[in-house]
């Protein structure tokens, strides 16, 4: 349990209470009690709580010094902008973002999500038996959430088992949208690290100038293989080794299957690799359902233009018993995530403040009244 503490300056802000957790101060809205630590990492510290007003169980993520690293600050801003618009059973819901006390100098950001029990990475490495029904249901939900994202014009770009949250009912929700981009974004191409290496599509490993929704499909294929085999299918040690592992399993590619590689040096490297006949997925995963193997090999196709789409995957015989297109509407409107990568800290902070206001309409109204009164007072200061 977190330890209640006094505020650092001795002055208690109305509506806030204070906790110490892993030597970090949490300044939490009083409607959230009790506060229990869950985990910590490079992303920040996470605790569980209950919203007393709604009785909902939530996860509170504190991002400490959110603006210390500009790239990380942009990731947080991007996630805020995106999750405000997304509403889907298989996408994590951002319930609240706590209102900072100081608009122009706040450093920490507190994000409040719906609470989940674990993630797919933890399940894969556990001793928990996974039946075909488990594998099928996890994949179905992942594809269903991804179809929704793609219908909103969004590429996730960082799908991996650790970014798929699971609860005790085996419900799955996609999370961590800090690397997400609109699929038509003009500055999306290889501007930064994209997708954890083991789940990175060949077109990204080969630094192709153009990529699309098929990069997410490749990641889904890698994740599904991990579930079937209970270990990573392509655990590369670095970029070139990653490509070698892919070719070893998929087999050497024909000339027409590498035409998408626009970099001559990259194409030459692929052609220089020793010949591999490939390894059938049915041999790698002998206990998997034959239809699961068929769908897997349609997702893990080297040439992105020949890779199965999310919609096609949902209509595949392995998924069709679960999929009903009539209960799976697309996103209402495409979402634009284009954000200037060169924004300075002050601008990012102000944009984040504006996003936070969407979760606090009462604060937004109070701010409008304040501006209104200030405008009324301006003429009186200049009267003779």
UniProtKB/Swiss-Prot annotation:
Dually phosphorylated on Thr-191 and Tyr-193, which activates the enzyme. PROSITE patterns: MAPK, PROTEIN_KINASE_ATP, PROTEIN_KINASE_DOM, PROTEIN_KINASE_ST. Gene3D superfamilies: Phosphorylase Kinase, domain 1 (3.30.200.20), Transferase(Phosphotransferase) domain 1 (1.10.510.10). The modification Phosphotyrosine is found at residue 193. The active site is at residue 158. ATP binds at residues 38-46, 61. Keywords: ATP-binding, Kinase, Nucleotide-binding, Phosphoprotein, Serine/threonine-protein kinase, Transferase. GO terms for molecular function: ATP binding; MAP kinase activity; protein serine kinase activity. CDD domains: STKc_TEY_MAPK (cd07858). Residues 32-319 form the Protein kinase domain. The keyword Nucleotide-binding applies. Its EC number is 2.7.11.24. It is an enzyme of class 2 (transferase). Activated by tyrosine and threonine phosphorylation. Its cofactor is Mg(2+). Disulfide bonds: none annotated. The keyword Phosphoprotein applies. The modification Phosphothreonine is found at residue 191. Expressed in vegetative organs such as leaf, root, or stem. In the reproductive organs, it is found in the ovary, but not in the stamen. It catalyses: L-seryl-[protein] + ATP = O-phospho-L-seryl-[protein] + ADP + H(+); L-threonyl-[protein] + ATP = O-phospho-L-threonyl-[protein] + ADP + H(+). A motif (TXY) lies at residues 191-193. The TXY motif contains the threonine and tyrosine residues whose phosphorylation activates the MAP kinases. Belongs to the protein kinase superfamily. CMGC Ser/Thr protein kinase family. MAP kinase subfamily. This is Mitogen-activated protein kinase homolog 1. The gene is MPK1.
